[in-house]
Regions:
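Bacterial carbohydrate/catabolite-sensing allosteric modules
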Residues: 1-127
Length: 127
């Protein structure tokens, strides 16, 4: 759909080391962009791809999830999805207490997110 081909990579740890381990399979896949499980994986992926001679974002765009402080401090700064972690934790506790008190709770709770565009993403090259 929309000319996008999705390729899943095998499971790697949700850490910088896991991201480094995912670099070779990501490079071999021919992907022009990767959305990582979290920012730590994305940062490890960025480092691992650089070691393989791949430039971010010229060769491959990388997006993380969480918007940890380090995401904006690296070069290139990491594009990421900011999640309302504190709000979701507080909401989870509220829902648990409601359920324990026998109060009916919504089956689905939607929390917003925000894409923070930084320097790790760009349009794919024409080649």
């Amino acid at each position: 759909r929309h000319g996008i081909r999705l390729t899943g990579l095998s499971h790697h740890a949700a850490s910088i080391q896991g991201g480094r381990a995912a670099a070779a399979p990501a490079a071999a896949s021919g992907a022009t962009a990767v959305i990582a499980y979290n920012d730590l994986v994305a940062l490890g992926l960025e480092a691992g791809l650089l070691e393989l001679g791949k430039r971010c974002p010229a060769d491959i765009s990388i997006v993380g999830i969480d918007d940890i402080d380090l995401a904006g401090a690296v070069t290139p700064a990491l594009t990421t999805v900011r999640m309302p972690i504190e709000r979701s934790g507080a909401l989870a506790v509220d829902l648990l207490l409601q359920a324990m008190n026998g109060t009916a709770i919504d089956d689905v709770v939607t929390l917003g997110s925000q894409l923070i565009v930084r320097a790790s993403t760009a349009a794919p090259s024409a080649s």
